[in-house]
Amino acid sequence: MNKIEKALMHALFVHLHHNIDKAIDFSIFKKLNQKVGQTWPAALLVGPDANDDAAVFNMPGSDCLVVAKMESHCSPCVPRPYDSAATGAGGAMRDVVAMGARPIFLLDFIGTRPMEQEVIVGPCGFDGKCTCGKCQVMTSQDRINLMLKGIADMCETMEVFVVGGGFSTSFSDIVPAVVVSVIGKQVTDQPLTKPAKSAGDKIIIIGETGTDGNDTLYRAGLVDTMQPAIALFKEERMAMDATLAAFATNKIKACSDLGAAGIGAAVCETARFGGLGAKVDLAAVPVRVADITPEEILICETQARMLLQVEPADVDEVLALIRSKNDVAAAVIGEITNDDQIVFEYNGEKIAVIPNHPSPEEIQQLGN
């Protein structure tokens, strides 16, 4: 297992793979699903325990499908409250889009320290004292205003309405609670789901990849400097519009957004949940910077990107529609394979090979 494989597998099977997080009782999700099913039979089409990007609910008494996603973005708001609140909102919106829906409404909740208390905003925010000379000292109220503005600016860009929210100043922790819920209306005939459907399907990426959002690489010692994910407002809207245009072809077989651990996590999850494999050419990925490395292309969490899967015969039609929306960057970067592993290459060189089902020994290595 090389360093890149270890970093990606740690993200997949430790950071993102909540099934092995004993702090979460998944029986609660099952009970909630059962309660919804008893109250509104057959209304819950995709539940919160379905290993997908969002839940899908058939509104009783209508043919309207509602897509919902709740997401927290707490710790990142300590050093960068504006950008992190905005990317949290944008990420939840992408999750709704990934199910084949157009985001419409957002509700938020912010829990923080009392308004008048001072907080450190910047790299030393978690320490409570600045030693780098780059932080700002501000009141909790000022930090709240930055977080609210980040959410509001993303909503304005995406034409999503903020319809309500909650607020508390009873939190004593340095880390604020920043939670958003996004509601959307299904625009595809049926919910699009994350699992890969067929070997041979092509993988299309929408949006460009940069070097920001490199937390996973930084923790693995693969880069020297951490670069937080940057809120890309205009690009986020362009990616959404391009994705919705692709949906109009009725040729999209699977869809997912790119969040934590980037292309690596998105491709590995779609393949594993579909019981298939994948092969990806990282050199084919559209990039924002010229000197980006293969591992940065693979794992960085650049915002405003989506992943689609289509049959080979439909690639040209789908790409043409995507690119018709403000000339959005899009490319075929790989294909689904009839395999049990995901292979990432760069100019013919294997960068990482990730098994769908790591052995206990491999999982144990991730903690070392």
Describe each region flagged by the PLM:
Residues M1-L32, K134, A196, K202-D241, ...:
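Intein/HINT protein-splicing elements and their conserved insertion hotspots or analogous self-processing inserts
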Residues N2-A101, L148-G164, S168-D173, A177, ...:
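N-terminal glycine-rich phosphate/pyrophosphate-binding loops that anchor nucleotide-derived ligands
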Residues I28, L32, V67-E71, V78-P81, ...:
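Short acidic, glycine/serine/threonine-rich loops at helix termini
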Residues L65-P76, L107, G111, M115-E118, ...:
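Gly-rich Lys/Arg/Thr-decorated short loops/hinges at beta-loop-alpha junctions or inter-strand turns
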Residues M70-C74, F109-Q117, G125, G166-S172, ...:
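Acidic, glycine-rich active-site loops and adjacent beta-strand->loop/helix elements
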Residues P76-D83, M115, C135-D142, T188-K194, ...:
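Alpha-helix capping and helix-loop boundary segments enriched in small/acidic/polar residues
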Residues F109-G122, C130-T139, R143-L146, D153:
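Acidic low-complexity segments
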Residues R143-D201, V289-N368:
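Phosphate/diphosphate-binding loops
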